[in-house]
Amino acid sequence: VPLIAGEARSDIVRDVSNVDSSPRNRAPGAGSHRTPLHALSAADSAWLRVDRDNNRMIITAVLTLERGVPFAKVQARLVDRLLPYPRLQQRIVTPKFAFGVPHWEDDPDFDIARQTEVVKLDNPADQSELESFVGGLMEQSLPVDRPLWRIYYVEKYVEKYDEKYDERVTAGGRTSDSSSAGAALVVRVHHCIADGIALLRILLSLSDEPPEITFPTAAAEWARSGKRASIARRVALGARTAARSIAHFANFLVSRSDPDTRFSTPLGRTKRAAWSNPIALEDIKQIGRASSGTVNEVLLSAAAGALGRVLEEDPQFESGLELRGVVPVNLRGDEPLSALGNKFGLVFMPMPVGIADSEARLEHVRESMARIKASPEALGWFAMLRALGRVPTWMEALGVELFSRKATLVITSLAGPKQQLHFCGSAIEDVMFWVPCAGNVGLGMSMLSYNGRVRLGVTADVGQLNNPAEIASEFESELRGSTSAGR
């Protein structure tokens, strides 16, 4: 039985070739000229095509603010910081022929008011209400007659979580007065516009003090060595990498599918979102120092342990169970972000969910990471994604089905700004994001550090996991237990 239900999404794009494209209702600061049609890159097209009714290919992020900001100021900041990127003012034109390529076109009706919305939840709204709102958004598509992004300004948001674990965080205590109540920005951007690295850097550029942030890249070492090497040496290196990639994919194709668990069941359309309490980054570093592990390895191990705790009551669970997590790997390097787009590969990370002992589990993760770093897997999958963006729909569906059978979740970890940022004078208290999933993969786990703390964001299909907060809670327990053991 195919894991992919139906054909590739067709409603995400439409033919707008006859729409009047004269510039009107443009936001202040936006260009008034029409740029020529520009074809989506192969990688961007791939992420557009894998969008499904039951698995939206949309990245979601949340920025929580200490104090509310007048909505007019919010819109003015968005115009100032986002509109210099032409892609964010463009919509997608579907090809007229079956084998055509979708294109970007300036939206003639672009207006920041059409891309933003004020949301009023409970007065004030707390984390549970915001989680419910975010989960509901994950079920929805984006309007296809405009750029594929949208930002919601949630009024009067007040976080409430366990104050004991991080005494530096104030839980509650605010009044419902708009001058003291907080707020939140919920950002949704379709994956075809840009990858998570690019979007995170753009979102953080909304701050009053845009930080200079760099992210680890698998291409960095190759690029550095390439500058020193001769052309012949670089060609030889590329040939060897290609040969290794082919061998790797051959092994991947004959490798086993992931074991059946509750996360193997078909997806529905209802999604849930949750996030953990903040965990002090210094505590995570302490765990790493005690076990010779990196922060990333500690986080991946804790995530595997949390997933194992949630699964241990399932009949399919057994000691030593291993599930694959798809990990995005940055290939962008230090190039400018003006063109946005998707420039990342994928690696399939063995997640030792069936190892209860935290030290043994961390050692397993460390060994797996060492093998992955020495392999060409990320570059190979980037090439595969580009191919999926150009092949016929039925071939793309087969590729996504293969992807679904070989993995159970998508998981990522990013290091954000070390200092607190501000948005229009209001402190940005936390930054969170959720990776989209593809095919029949319905579980996503995203870890991000910001201002000396780390949070885990979890998204899940309700048919596979009704309450993703279970994983978030177990993630905290794993790290607290490891911290206590190391002291």
Residues covered by each model-derived region:
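Soluble acyl-CoA-dependent acyltransferase catalytic core bearing the H(X)4D motif
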Residues: L3, D11-A43, V50-R52, R56-V441, ...
